[in-house]
């Protein structure tokens, strides 16, 4: 389910044409700052869950997330992939309730959770 956080971490990348990467317009967003700020994290999560307003970068993330999940972040920049890993690790270990809400919305049939099962297990703190 690296998918959803992938997108979260991509920090709102823009839709790319086939064969290209998503826009790096938002790659300067400090993912760790977002994760450590309840206000910022809540804003992104509420945007992704259709529970709140979206900032421009939040909207791009929301629009890009389904594609990133479907195609294993194949259009993500290296910075976006790294950010996605950071976000996934944080949500899985520190905010499992948010992870679950996002999973219900973006992976209701557990397709991606099954596809990324090994990766998810590897980030869990035991």
From Swiss-Prot:
Keyword Secreted included in the entry's annotation: yes
Annotated localization: Secreted
Gene Ontology cellular component terms for the protein in this record: extracellular region
Keyword Signal: yes
Top-level taxon in the UniProt lineage: Eukaryota
Signal peptide: 1-18
The entry's keywords: Allergen, Secreted, Signal
SUPFAM superfamilies: Chemosensory protein Csp2 (SSF100910)
Membrane-crossing segments per the record: none
Chief localisation class: secreted
Family: Belongs to the insect A10/OS-D protein family.
Protein name per Swiss-Prot or TrEMBL: Allergen Tha p 1
């Amino acid at each position: 389910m690296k998918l959803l956080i992938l997108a979260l971490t991509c920090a709102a990348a823009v839709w790319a044409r086939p064969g290209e990467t998503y826009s790096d317009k938002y790659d300067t967003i400090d993912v760790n700052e977002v994760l450590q700020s309840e206000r910022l994290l809540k804003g992104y999560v509420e945007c992704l869950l259709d529970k709140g307003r979206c900032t421009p970068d939040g909207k791009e993330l929301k629009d890009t997330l389904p594609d990133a999940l479907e195609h294993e972040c194949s259009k993500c920049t290296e910075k976006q992939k790294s950010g996605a890993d950071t976000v996934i690790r944080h949500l899985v270990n520190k905010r499992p309730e948010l992870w679950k809400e996002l999973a219900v919305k973006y992976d209701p049939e557990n397709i991606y959770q099954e596809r990324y099962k090994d990766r998810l297990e590897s980030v869990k703190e035991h």
